[in-house]
A protein has these predicted regions:
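N-terminal secretory signal peptides that target proteins for export/translocation
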Residues: 1-5
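Bacterial N-terminal signal peptides
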Residues: 8-20
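N-terminal nucleophile
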Residues: 26-295
Length: 295
């Protein structure tokens, strides 16, 4: 594993020291897309990235909610863009974003589409991060509900929320209920960092960005009541430029390991107070990467 830090200390070592050894946990099966998904809290921080040269697109996420709908937040349309729909998740809004990506709409257009309080009574509980590409131009746009922003800005606030992006590098990082702003700031820095050893593929950048957010503290709910876990669920999905679009039809990590899954689809879930899932996600990712390289 290669880290983004110039000190030479790897993220794997930092995570191991801070969070303890990792153990595999069974992946939870969750409600289908017909269930009351808009009442479920989804995703504390996520990273959306695109490669305008190859057309590859991907999303990585982590949350303290163990029974999260991790895979459902992602909308991937190779060659056009990717998005994360999170906080108070609504599959209908995810589908709107997905359809707009397939239509080739810009990131700003997509955010306008889903940030209208007239059509969404729960807009204040939503968060989005979108990255689009067209004709070599990359655009980023994000949205965080005002109540989340107001709460993060309050005196002595302990639940930071917001979006940070870098359009020139094709990345957007968004999060809510975070320990502090460093979770997204460090994730963004990790994503754009150039590993001198060459571990700079889209998937490499996504996973090291997610790890950097974990090292910064992650989800405040997993860092309270003597628990120092940062997350309970972690996931990464990537589709290549030549692949078809992807947004899961049956949420609950059910596509993992099936023909429906995108080129890269890895997830892991642990119980609250258990081992940090980012460690197991890295182990699975490194194994996947070695297998892909051999092939």
């Amino acid at each position: 594993m290669r880290a983004w830090m110039n000190t030479g200390t790897t993220l794997a070592l930092l995570a191991s020291v801070a969070l303890g050894a990792c153990a595999q946990s069974n992946v939870a099966r969750l409600p289908s897309r017909t269930g009351p998904t808009d009442k479920l809290d989804m995703t504390t921080w996520s990273v959306v990235g695109v490669d305008p040269v190859s057309g590859d697109v991907g999303v990585a996420m982590a949350s303290c909610v163990a029974n999260t709908l991790a895979d459902a937040l992602a909308a991937l349309v190779p060659g056009k863009g990717a998005a994360a729909t999170q906080a108070a998740f609504d599959v209908g809004n995810r589908d709107k974003v997905y359809a707009a990506l397939k239509e080739g709409r810009s990131a700003e257009e997509i955010i306008r589409l889903v940030s209208d309080s007239v059509t969404d009574a729960r807009l204040g509980s939503r968060q989005y991060g979108v990255v689009t590409m067209s004709g070599g131009r990359v655009q980023t746009a994000g949205f965080t509900g005002k109540p989340m922003l107001d709460g993060a800005a309050a005196p002595n606030a302990s639940r930071w929320a917001g979006v940070r992006a870098n359009a020139s590098r094709g990345v957007s990082v968004q999060g809510n209920t975070l320990v502090n702003e460093a979770v997204v700031a460090n994730a963004l820095a990790a994503y754009v960092w150039e590993d001198p050893t060459g571990f700079n593929s889209l998937s490499d950048r996504l996973i090291r960005a997610l790890e950097a957010g974990s090292v910064a503290g992650g989800d405040v709910r997993c860092n309270s009541d003597s628990v120092r876990q940062t997350a309970a669920t972690a996931m990464i999905v990537v589709a290549r430029g030549t692949d078809g679009p992807y947004a899961t039809e049956k949420i609950g990590l059910s596509d993992q390991g099936t023909p429906k899954a995108p080129w890269l689809a890895i997830s892991t879930t642990t119980s609250r107070g258990g081992d940090n899932p980012l460690l197991d996600l890295r182990r699975k990712y490194d194994l996947w990467r070695r297998t892909v390289k051999k092939n």
